[in-house]
Amino acid sequence: TYEEIQPFMDKIHSQHKALKKSSKMRQEFTANVSHELKTPLASISGYAELIETGMAKEGDIQHFASEIHKSANRLLSLINDIIELSQLDVMDHQLSTTNVSLNEEVVSCVDMLQMNAEKHNITIATDIIEKDCIIKANQEMIQEVIYNLCDNAIRYNKPEGHVWASVFKKDDNIILQVKDDGIGIPEDDLNRIFERFYRVDKARSKKTGGTGLGLAIVKHIAEQHEAEIQIDSTLGEGTTISIIFKTMNK
């Protein structure tokens, strides 16, 4: 009967809309990446040609080399995003786990990002780091989660802003938390920021870089580890993202 078929038709219609939406976002992503790949490549080619042909003045060579270095780093970042996108759908088959010390991984990541934070005039530090916060997880994936959360907090911050990374125990859980006092996220966007390709402020994203995949990767990895994500954000005041892991004895 119609009543019996209707739920299936509604489900198919909903899936069709989701596929169209995903396809549109993928097209926007491809167009954006194509543009962003060309920009640093053109910069590298242009500055390198000036140096190679001897047209660069001696005092300009160091500046040109610096610009080439910046553009090369931008290219590397884009390529890494594209690789991560291709890996999202195969992560399900690669979840080999071991005992991972969250406190050690957070300290290591914060140390690694110090120089990048300083370039953006941002202070990044560990806040609460409890010992023996051990989870059963894929170490590389956990490193990716911590890096993406901290990198986003640096990227979308204010001048002279702060980023704090914490690991602590609460009830029967171990919580990884990254907090910033940056620009915050509009309430209407909170439910969408973990979607693939989604970027809250496209104009700002073009300035800061990134392809809108970082938080999608975080969400996917969290789901793989049966972890819960909580986000609290106030526009103009900052954002706190918490990943709640079950303890090993649960």
Q: What are these language model-derived features?
A:
Residues 52-59:
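Short acidic helix/loop segment immediately C-terminal to the autophosphorylated histidine
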Residues 70-76:
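Short alpha-helical segment of the dimerization/phosphotransfer core of two-component systems
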Residues 90-95, 134-137:
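Conserved micro-motifs of the catalytic ATP-binding
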Residues 96-101, 118, 123-133:
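Conserved catalytic submotifs in the C-terminal HATPase_c
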Residues 160-172:
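Short beta-strand/loop element within the Bergerat-fold HATPase_c
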Residues 185-199:
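Short conserved segment of the HATPase_c
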Residues 226-227:
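Conserved glycine-rich
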